[in-house]
């Protein structure tokens, strides 16, 4: 039988349009066949009128090939097997853009580059069979550069009223309807004519943020498909271009998840700040900027300012590791008792535990002048005493007692009020 070229349906043109975005995300897609597994979920979210755009492209292609339009697109399977994938994608004259979507040829271009970090919170995630997967309730975005730090920010609550979410909430005047919010966001990230800048969010939030953007855009007369990329790819791209080395995604994620600024001032919106609520869409965006500044400032010789990180917290926690995991608590306690040279680390660790984020002090703040030889939780010492020989039982009665919030200053421990 003579060879026959595979027909192109609506799904083929949808996948072809998605290939540049998939490449920017670092996915190995050299042709349409490679991209099909990554596009099925986005295709399922499209409405019939949105799919009609790609169906029209398929009809025009068949007409140009001199073929009959044949049965309608609705009668064809969504994913048609491609017999000759190598013939389906036209050759590109230019190489695909790098991960960051920016030209990182020089340090100056990178330092002056503008980045937008975005996050959208939802009331929850609905089951897969529901047409509306998320209920957007809050949006935050910051304009950032390595040189200037956070240059501007945008924040708004999305009115969860009867017209959108069917969730009536009274006495909450800070919310706006979805059309107003998305139009204000457009004006924030694109105040002047020209190319729209790429927007970045964390990879774990990308599916939710991308869906909410498209959903909110349907309520507005202004339709703009924003280019949503991941912060992890941006950081990897910066390191790769600057140092010719690519850090692991796991390391980058840990870089963006530090907790030292969770309770810092001027990191949340006014409402969350006044009500002392940790979770805030604007705080997520500012935290991304803070983490990137803290990681790259010394590498590029940038002088940190309050626009880069909360300085009052950065200076106090400069020598304290924000996170610490002890895998073997028993061995750790024993090491602290037997090793005289371990006292410095012991004191530092005790200070870090005393500054667990409780609202009184930001996480990671180091309080100097507090020394303690307490060996940990009482249950640990109890188990040690049980396992010791009977001749040493009398030592248990002379052990120090664990620190508690009710220990008075006369026992050698300073209260929180005396440390401030």
From Swiss-Prot:
GO terms for cellular component: cytoplasm; nucleus; P granule; piP-body. Residues 4-73 bind DNA. SUPFAM superfamilies: HMG-box. It holds the Pfam family Maelstrom. GO terms for molecular function: sequence-specific DNA binding. Its main location: cytoplasm. It is found in: Cytoplasm; Nucleus. Keywords: Cytoplasm, Developmental protein, Differentiation, DNA-binding, Meiosis, Nucleus, RNA-mediated gene silencing, Spermatogenesis. The keyword Nucleus applies. Residues 62-94, 341-372, 392-420 are annotated as: Disordered. Residues 344-358, 392-407 have a biased composition (Polar residues). GO terms for biological process: cell differentiation; male meiotic nuclear division; negative regulation of DNA-templated transcription; piRNA processing; regulation of miRNA-mediated gene silencing; regulatory ncRNA-mediated gene silencing; spermatogenesis. Belongs to the maelstrom family. Interacts with SMARCB1, SIN3B and DDX4. Interacts with piRNA-associated proteins TDRD1, PIWIL1 and PIWIL2. Interacts with TEX19. Plays a central role during spermatogenesis by repressing transposable elements and preventing their mobilization, which is essential for the germline integrity. Acts via the piRNA metabolic process, which mediates the repression of transposable elements during meiosis by forming complexes composed of piRNAs and Piwi proteins and governs the methylation and subsequent repression of transposons. Its association with piP-bodies suggests a participation in the secondary piRNAs metabolic process. Required for the localization of germ-cell factors to the meiotic nuage. This is Protein maelstrom homolog. It comes from Bos taurus. The lineage of its organism: Eukaryota, Metazoa, Chordata, Craniata, Vertebrata.
């Amino acid at each position: 039988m003579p060879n026959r070229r595979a027909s192109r349906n609506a799904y083929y043109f949808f996948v072809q349009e998605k290939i540049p975005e998939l490449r920017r995300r670092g996915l190995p897609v050299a042709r349409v066949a490679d991209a099909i597994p990554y596009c099925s979920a986005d295709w399922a979210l499209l409405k019939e009128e949105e799919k009609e755009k790609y169906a029209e492209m398929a009809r025009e292609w068949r007409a140009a090939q001199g073929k009959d339009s044949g049965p309608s697109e609705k009668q064809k399977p969504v994913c048609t097997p491609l017999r000759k994938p190598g013939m389906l994608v036209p050759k590109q004259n230019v190489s695909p853009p790098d991960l960051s979507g920016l030209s990182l040829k020089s340090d100056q271009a990178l330092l002056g580059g503008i980045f937008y970090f975005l996050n959208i919170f939802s009331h929850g995630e609905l089951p897969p069979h529901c047409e509306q997967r998320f209920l957007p309730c809050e949006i935050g975005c910051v304009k950032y550069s390595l040189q200037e730090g956070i240059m501007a920010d945008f924040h708004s609550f999305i009115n969860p009223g009867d017209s959108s979410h069917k969730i009536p909430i009274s006495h909450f005047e800070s919310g706006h309807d979805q059309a107003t919010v998305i139009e204000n966001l457009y004006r924030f990230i694109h105040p002047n004519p020209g190319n729209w800048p790429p927007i970045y969010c964390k990879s774990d939030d990308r599916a939710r943020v991308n869906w909410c953007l498209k959903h909110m855009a349907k309520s507005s007369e202004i339709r703009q498909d924003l280019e949503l990329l991941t912060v992890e790819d941006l950081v990897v791209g910066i390191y790769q271009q600057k140092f010719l080395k690519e850090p692991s995604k796991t390391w980058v994620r840990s870089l963006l998840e530090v907790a030292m600024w969770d309770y810092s001032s001027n990191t949340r919106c006014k409402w969350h700040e006044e009500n002392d609520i940790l979770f805030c869409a604007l705080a997520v965006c500012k935290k991304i900027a803070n983490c990137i500044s803290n990681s790259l400032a010394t590498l590029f010789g940038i002088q940190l300012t309050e626009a880069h990180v909360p300085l009052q917290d950065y200076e106090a926690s400069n020598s304290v590791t924000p996170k610490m995991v002890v895998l073997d608590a028993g061995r750790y306690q024993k090491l602290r008792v037997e090793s005289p040279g371990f006292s410095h680390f012991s004191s530092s660790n005790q200070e870090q535990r005393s500054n667990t984020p409780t609202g009184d002090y930001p996480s990671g703040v180091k309080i100097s002048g507090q020394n303690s030889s307490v060996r940990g939780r009482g249950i640990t010492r109890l188990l040690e005493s049980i396992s010791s020989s009977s001749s040493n039982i009398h030592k248990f009665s002379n052990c120090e007692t664990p620190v508690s919030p009710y220990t008075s200053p006369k026992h050698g421990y300073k209260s929180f009020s005396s440390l401030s």
